[in-house]
Amino acid sequence: MESITISQLKNWKRNKKKIAAITAYDFSFSRLFSNCGIPVILIGDSLGMTIQGHTSTLPVKIEDIAYHTKAVRKGAPNTFLISDLPFMSYYDTKQALKNTAKIIRSGANMIKMEGGKWLIEIIRELSNRLILICGHIGLIPQSFHYLGGYKVQGRKENDANKLIDEALLLEEAGINMLILECIPEKLAKKITESLSIPVIGIGSGKNTDGQILVMHDLLGITEGKTPSFTKNFLSESDSIQKAIQKYIYEVEHSIYPSKKHSF
């Protein structure tokens, strides 16, 4: 697979080619995903739960993300890598610049930050320094205490309008991609059509420019109850490789997510 670039991903949006993304945290799985044709991998702070055994993403540190980014880059040299900036690692511009540099040096193509209007000035500073940025709005796990838990966001008209405004402001400030998590399908469609950058959904319906899932959910190895928007692709396949290929196919052909995976 040739190296995936942000220019290609923007072309995919224009050409209505769906983007199938997944999380990964190590060499072996990232190599497998890359060989299957996954174009985008997120080194997510979800590793706090899936790898470290915490009950949330909050304990994850920048050093953890850097370590796992290096491992994933070795396994997926040509895949487009997005790495999370974890909780309280970008509370001001100076800290955001310092930690972004650490993550980019570790092999990421792009960094991801959760939040809305309060991030605008930080995003502008990073964008002015030609850093690729992925925004993340809707359900933002780093703020689950404030949100009252892991709940669908944007159901009420005022909340929906706020998310639309935030998406537009983030794009104007300089983000190059946006993740929408756990918002109603119609709202996600409206936001996706309003932006010129790729919009990736998780629990936000099929009308975004692509989908992302936590690998443990996709493979059915998550402990306990999984979110209703996830699908166990391994249960319908006889190997991990075929499960990943099925995921890619279903995303690219708008089979997944179906209505039962949407809000």
From Swiss-Prot:
UniProt keyword DNA-binding present: no
Transferase in keyword set: yes
Pathway noted in the entry: Cofactor biosynthesis; (R)-pantothenate biosynthesis; (R)-pantoate from 3-methyl-2-oxobutanoate: step 1/2
Named cofactor requirement(s): Mg(2+)
Domain of life of the organism encoding this protein: Bacteria
InterPro entries xrefs: Pantoate_hydroxy_MeTrfase, Pyrv/PenolPyrv_kinase-like_dom, Pyrv_kinase-like_dom_sf
Catalyses which reaction(s): 3-methyl-2-oxobutanoate + (6R)-5,10-methylene-5,6,7,8-tetrahydrofolate + H2O = 2-dehydropantoate + (6S)-5,6,7,8-tetrahydrofolate
Active-site residues annotated for this sequence: 181
Cofactor details (free text): Binds 1 Mg(2+) ion per subunit.
Subcellular location: Cytoplasm
GO biological process, any: pantothenate biosynthetic process
GO molecular function, one term: 3-methyl-2-oxobutanoate hydroxymethyltransferase activity
GO CC field: cytoplasm
Positions of Mg(2+) binding: 45, 84, 114
Family from the record: Belongs to the PanB family.
Subunit structure: Homodecamer; pentamer of dimers.
Stated role: Catalyzes the reversible reaction in which hydroxymethyl group from 5,10-methylenetetrahydrofolate is transferred onto alpha-ketoisovalerate to form ketopantoate.
Protein name: 3-methyl-2-oxobutanoate hydroxymethyltransferase
Organism annotation: Buchnera aphidicola subsp. Acyrthosiphon pisum (strain 5A)
Encoding gene per record: panB
